[in-house]
UniProtKB/Swiss-Prot annotation:
HAMAP family assigned to the protein according to its UniProt record, in alphabetical order: IspG
Lineage of the species this protein comes from: Bacteria, Pseudomonadati, Pseudomonadota, Gammaproteobacteria, Enterobacterales
InterPro entries for the chain: Dihydropteroate_synth-like_sf (IPR011005), Enolase-like_C_sf (IPR036849), IspG_bac (IPR016425), IspG_bac-typ (IPR004588), NO2/SO3_Rdtase_4Fe4S_sf (IPR045854)
Cofactor binding annotation: Binds 1 [4Fe-4S] cluster.
GO BP terms in the entry: isopentenyl diphosphate biosynthetic process, methylerythritol 4-phosphate pathway; terpenoid biosynthetic process
Gene Ontology molecular-function annotations: 4 iron, 4 sulfur cluster binding; 4-hydroxy-3-methylbut-2-en-1-yl diphosphate synthase activity (ferredoxin); 4-hydroxy-3-methylbut-2-enyl-diphosphate synthase activity (flavodoxin); iron ion binding
Biological role: Converts 2C-methyl-D-erythritol 2,4-cyclodiphosphate (ME-2,4cPP) into 1-hydroxy-2-methyl-2-(E)-butenyl 4-diphosphate.
Pathway named in the protein's UniProt entry: Isoprenoid biosynthesis; isopentenyl diphosphate biosynthesis via DXP pathway; isopentenyl diphosphate from 1-deoxy-D-xylulose 5-phosphate: step 5/6
Encoding gene per record: ispG
Coiled-coil portions: none
Signal peptide: none
PANTHER family: 4-HYDROXY-3-METHYLBUT-2-EN-1-YL DIPHOSPHATE SYNTHASE, 4-HYDROXY-3-METHYLBUT-2-EN-1-YL DIPHOSPHATE SYNTHASE (FERREDOXIN), CHLOROPLASTIC
Name listed for the protein in its UniProt record: 4-hydroxy-3-methylbut-2-en-1-yl diphosphate synthase (flavodoxin)
Enzyme Commission number(s) from the entry: 1.17.7.3
Family listed: Belongs to the IspG family.
Length: 373
């Protein structure tokens, strides 16, 4: 029920990764990356399908060898989500996966080789109508840039990116996006700001090697949150030393928190104190697990007492305010006569949320049908 965020998106050109639009005002796409051995086709396919179930838009797959390229061909045949091939060192692998139907090629300027090799990749991408991501990383800058700057700096990352943007410009190839990732939040943020001011292409955001599930999520939320709030960014990936499924969940949570893109339930819950009238923490944890399958955007407030509960419920799709034995229930900001038994809170609230989601989905379907006529 909250209004969309007052964020003006940076204007950019548009490309397509498979059927997913990127840039020029398209919804910010959430990306992840497999961490299986690509040659283990079954494990990789299973992981990609798990990512699909939580709503991933694009998946990157590392293709380090020709054997992995052959495996990639089989993987591509078994999944629906667009796949980006992550290519380092051997440009010939890019040519092979292009032949096998890859949806985007990620190349690293720090190790892909000279301009002739890049030309070969570009010619192949043009032939198969495949976009490219220039993926600059603070940990693998070109040797001459490392020597020039001494350490990764925003200017160093920008120079690496612009060197390869200029090559693609000379080759008259404009179907690309760019990233300038670093593990340091401030380094990454400033690098992206500099790049956003220089080019019109879409930008892929990320804090590389951010860390484990908790610390990595915090770093990514700070860094990407800063950039997204400034309108910078067209796709994103949360890099975690964790299950890739968690990357997708955190990515959507960041977009949801900034009200840039809504998917699923935005839970608003108090941290609890001695005034709580029911188990708020247990209720929220249980509902987050039970309702992971819902994609209908809605705000659900779960507040343990009457101090802030009514106010939060007024601006929520579904709201609960703790009371003695029974708690108040709100729908679309209106207090209902029905009250929830505190001992049955989880089951009752789940039923109400699912019913509301079904109504909202049906309403949207009817609207679409009327427009089509």
């Amino acid at each position: 029920m909250h209004n969309a965020a007052p964020i003006t998106r940076r204007k950019s050109t548009r490309i397509y990764v498979g059927k997913v639009p990127v840039g020029d005002g398209a919804p910010i796409a959430v990306q992840s990356m497999t961490n299986t051995r690509t040659t283990d086709v079954e494990a990789t396919v299973n992981q990609i399908k798990a990512l699909e179930r939580v709503g991933v838009d694009i998946v990157r797959v590392s293709v380090p060898t020709m054997d992995a390229a052959e495996a990639f061909k089989l993987i591509k045949q078994q999944v629906n989500v667009p796949l980006v091939a992550d290519i380092h060192f051997d440009y010939r692998i890019a040519l092979k996966v292009a032949e096998y139907g890859v949806d985007c090629l990620r190349i690293n300027p720090g190790n892909i080789g000279n301009e002739e090799r890049i030309r070969s990749v570009v010619d192949c991408a043009r032939y198969y109508n495949i976009p490219i991501r220039i993926g600059v990383n603070g940990g693998s800058l070109e040797k001459d840039i490392q020597e020039k700057y001494g350490e990764p700096t925003p200017e160093a990352l920008l120079e690496s990116a612009m060197r390869h943007v200029d090559i693609l410009d000379r080759l008259n190839f404009d179907q690309f996006k760019v990233s300038v990732k670093a593990s340091d939040v401030f380094l990454a943020v400033q690098s992206y700001r500099l790049l956003a001011a220089r080019i019109d292409q879409p930008l892929h955001l990320g804090i590389t090697e951010a860390g484990g599930a908790r610390s990595g999520a915090v770093k990514s939320a700070i860094g990407l949150g800063l950039l997204l709030s400034e309108g910078i960014g067209d796709t994103l990936r949360i890099s975690l030393a964790a299950d890739p499924v968690e990357e997708v969940k955190v990515g959507f949570d960041i977009l949801k928190s900034l009200r840039i893109r809504a998917r699923g339930i935005n839970f608003i819950a108090c941290p609890t104190c001695s005034r709580q009238e029911f188990d708020v923490i247990g209720t929220v944890n249980a509902l987050e697990q039970r309702l992971e399958d819902l994609i209908t955007p809605m705000d659900v407030s779960i507040i343990g007492c009457v101090v802030n509960g009514p106010g939060e419920a007024l601006v929520s799709t579904i709201g609960v305010t703790g009371g003695h034995n029974k708690s108040g229930f709100y729908e679309d900001g209106v207090r209902q006569r029905e009250r929830f038994d505190n001992e049955q809170m989880i089951d009752q609230l789940e039923a109400k949320i699912r019913a509301k989601a079904s109504m909202m989905d049906e309403s949207q379907r009817i609207t679409v049908n009327l427009v089509d006529k």
